[in-house]
Design a protein with these regions (language model features):
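LRR N-terminal entry segment and analogous cap-like coil->beta motifs
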Residues: 1-10
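Residues on the solvent-exposed faces and adjacent turns
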Residues: 5, 26, 47, 68, ...
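Low-complexity, intrinsically disordered tandem-repeat tracts enriched in small/polar residues
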Residues: 7, 18-20, 39-41, 49, ...
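Conserved hydrophobic beta-strand positions in leucine-rich repeat
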Residues: 10-14, 31-35, 52-56, 73-77, ...
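Canonical leucine-rich repeat
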Residues: 1, 22-24, 43-45, 64-66, ...
Length: 171
């Protein structure tokens, strides 16, 4: 898929194909990218600083750099092979769906607008959500989390934390 000459593109829907590469360096105006369920092993979105919605789920990604994408409000990167995810620069995020990866840590302290977080089916041993006071939905099931403090999360309407190693749950 060659979109290098389509510099005015704001939306790309290329999901459920067999794409192994996607060159987006000339698509600086891109706001919405839906490239889920392909065969992508890498995704460079460093030049796509206008991105607000990204769904790259169901690929073969081992890493994802969203540090330049400070306007992101929704991030769907589940069902990949991602081992680390730094979302500390993405302070506009309201939804992060990074389940079914290989994450060993996830820092969400800077993401104070976060309302939905699904980080289940990873390898997390801890999750600090004290700063995420707007959180409505949290699914951190099937990790190795030892303790979980949801005392500051008074807006929670859904909490799923089964199949962890919890010895302490502060509600």
């Amino acid at each position: 898929l060659d979109v290098s000459k389509n510099t005015e593109l704001e939306w790309i829907y290329c999901y459920k194909n067999a794409l192994t590469a996607l060159d987006l360096r000339y698509n600086a105006r891109l706001k919405w990218l839906f490239c889920y369920e392909n065969a992508l092993t890498s995704l460079d979105i460093g030049n796509n600083r206008e991105l607000t919605e990204l769904d790259c789920s169901g690929n073969l990604l081992t890493s994802l750099d969203v540090s330049c994408n400070t306007k992101l409000t929704s991030l769907f990167c589940y069902d990949n092979r991602i081992t680390s995810l730094d979302i500390s620069n993405n302070m506009e995020l309201t939804g992060v769906f990074c389940y079914k990866n290989s994450l060993t840590s996830l820092a969400v302290g800077n993401n104070t607008q976060l309302k939905n977080l699904n980080c289940s089916h990873n390898r997390l041993t801890s999750l600090d959500i004290k700063q995420n006071t707007l959180l409505n939905n949290l699914n951190c099931s099937e990790n190795s989390i030892l303790s979980l403090d949801v005392g500051n999360n008074t807006e929670l309407t859904f909490l799923s934390c089964y199949k962890n190693r919890l010895t302490m749950l502060d509600i």
